[in-house]
Amino acid sequence: MVISPSLSALHTLAHNARQAALHLGSLNTAERNQAIAAIADGLTAAMPEILAANQEDCAAAEAMGIAKPLYNRLLLGESKLKSTIAGVKDVEHLPDPLGQVTLHRQLDEGLVLKRVGCPLGVLGVIFEARPEALIQISSLAIKSGNAVILKGGREATRSCQVLTEVIQTALAKTVVSPEAINLLTTREEIRELLGLNQYVDLIIPRGSNEFVQYIQQNTQIPVLGHADGICHLYLDAQADLSKAIPITVDAKTQYPAACNAIETLLVHQAIAAEFLPPLAQALGEKGVSLRGDSGTQKLIDCEPATEADWCTEYSDLILSIKIVDSLEAAIDHINQYGSKHTDGIISEDLTAAEQFCQRVDSAGVYHNCSTRFADGFRYGFGAEVGISTQKMPPRGPVGLEGLVTYKYQLWGHGHIAATYTGQGAKAFTHLDL
Amino acid sequence: MVISPSLSALHTLAHNARQAALHLGSLNTAERNQAIAAIADGLTAAMPEILAANQEDCAAAEAMGIAKPLYNRLLLGESKLKSTIAGVKDVEHLPDPLGQVTLHRQLDEGLVLKRVGCPLGVLGVIFEARPEALIQISSLAIKSGNAVILKGGREATRSCQVLTEVIQTALAKTVVSPEAINLLTTREEIRELLGLNQYVDLIIPRGSNEFVQYIQQNTQIPVLGHADGICHLYLDAQADLSKAIPITVDAKTQYPAACNAIETLLVHQAIAAEFLPPLAQALGEKGVSLRGDSGTQKLIDCEPATEADWCTEYSDLILSIKIVDSLEAAIDHINQYGSKHTDGIISEDLTAAEQFCQRVDSAGVYHNCSTRFADGFRYGFGAEVGISTQKMPPRGPVGLEGLVTYKYQLWGHGHIAATYTGQGAKAFTHLDL
């Protein structure tokens, strides 16, 4: 493809990334795995250089007065780097997501249709402070035959630059083009990237709700991810208290900033008086602030919950509580206020659980367990690309299969459509092979 | 869900459609099939009424001076209506696309993950003149457990209104809510529909390229469809002339307005002098106008092709021809100018064919057969929802599986995430069942 000289540097970079992707996508499993092994080796050899660049990023961030949690995410110590490199080797050993034949059908004698797994092409991944994300994403991209254009957090610029150079140098010794892995460093480039429909096949944003929403609203490229994670737990009339308390505590407090932590607890009125006081005590011991509707306020000590609470992802040790008069009311509340992420029911009534799992319109519907299990690693996917709250697949926690698509191959021997139309039309055999 | 009185009628309609969808999605196969059978019966009983309304539409369109092809699409004669009703009965007998378990895994003892096929929710389908599309879409929607909001062509308003009433009346006698099938009648409602992200899960536009592009660019709701269909056929150095001629003629002339008809023929220079004259003669006999690059112009009588020709979907008996010096050049041309729809190679060289099928970045990659096979019915999908040229699945011709998604159900016995994290963390079993 000829690039006109008037096109921007990013345009050229994206064009070259697509060319690299077309080549990468035609490599076999061993060739892609060798490239991943070369990345692991290159990173291991360059550890001192990488850690030094990260130290510079950390020092600069500290001088700017960065918040402690962000600093911790930016900091790439030796043990974090080593375990990330070990993760690269894990990716090398994952099953190949490409080449799977999911349909193999004779349409007629000598005319055979195959649906074959193939890469998406070019991924645009925008992530925040954690520099090890660049390593993880690069190895997943190569495993799945995709080129990637990365944009890391501003604070991590030096780390990301060194990591990209090390990975590109490693790739240069393999059959994979170094142009398969690309780094953007300015915020302006994000907006331009979002307009490159002809080169970029999927955008994966990792960051705040507002950031993901901004991306979703400013691109025609498909976006894999989720803005909100407003998850619910519903304690049914037939809930078992000995399950309800530990699951509620786990779902709220085990990692409150996670998208799969609960924000609202729905409690059936039949058990509210019995359950809420011990629940409030258990949650209080973990430092959770409670906000309740009027019924809840009569039973336990809590702040009043307003309409806004039902729509809020606290990402913090805060829980809103509402008393509902039926399973139907719980389902309706979740379908209205939830973000289609993950919602659970605690009940010993299997019919109620089945109703809940069928009628709640979320990617994850859970019975008698914590919403915190909504995660690609916990599902056994090996690697997690993200969690999608869209309805169209891939939905929920997404592993490598979110980075691949398929194409239809049709192999004939001179077959033409006219043979199968009009008077005397030949019938298709449609015989699965 | 409570609807504020300030919301529009369409908002309320969409809200009610979503409620109907949640109920419809929880029905079993037999219940949904009974509703489809009731629709077929209702339509059969109401045939005189439907044909009369269609006659009115046709008379009004004729008075407005409607073009003949559009008139033919609008006209719903007795035989077309009967065969459409027969199609409804076919949908009744298709396999149920819902409820398939595509993953069933023990995460740990007593903690079982299932990925289960489920409906998308509410479909927005915007179609043109053909009133029978309303019947087809309604039956596919109910089969797949989805509600639908339909907008037909302006010319077909009377036909669509009667059809919708007949279908709703038929549904009222079943467990499916009549609110599952809805009709919009004004163009203004389309724009509002495109903004109803919270209710509508998928938009399926059927119409001109410009119309589909307009839809794609004006909604955050996923769109299933394709704007362009710029398909190619490449005659390789090792092409067999006895296959090349009939396949080229079929791919161009069998139905030139179809999206899977070819627009550009790429010819390897090694065979151009031998192949182009007989090809030009065969195409000329079918009334095809040829536009060639400079090399082509030296070999056959044709108009000059300009850069714009490589980007044009003629949808007519016009074919552009370009001579290329290698397989690589053919692949590059297709990846640059094609619309990722369907592209074919004619060659006796299997290595070249495999290279082509691997490196051409299209939903359909064909060897030694006509691109006209790109079609859900020909692929054996039973019913076609549309053809998608997006990279993310569903891609290519899409059957009922394009109207379904999945959710993850997790069934536990009090399991919490804390058990599996930190020191002394329990390992997951990840045992496929």
From Swiss-Prot, chains A, B:
Write out the catalysed reaction. L-glutamate 5-semialdehyde + phosphate + NADP(+) = L-glutamyl 5-phosphate + NADPH + H(+)
Say if the entry is tagged with keyword DNA repair: no
Q: Name one GO molecular function term.
A: NADP binding
What does the record list as GO biological process?
L-proline biosynthetic process
List the Pfam families: Aldedh
| Signal peptide extent | none
**Protein purpose:** Catalyzes the NADPH-dependent reduction of L-glutamate 5-phosphate into L-glutamate 5-semialdehyde and phosphate. The product spontaneously undergoes cyclization to form 1-pyrroline-5-carboxylate.
Q: Which family does it belong to?
A: Belongs to the gamma-glutamyl phosphate reductase family.
What is the official name of this protein in its record? Answer: Gamma-glutamyl phosphate reductase 1
**Highest lineage ranks of the organism?**
Bacteria, Bacillati, Cyanobacteriota, Cyanophyceae, Synechococcales
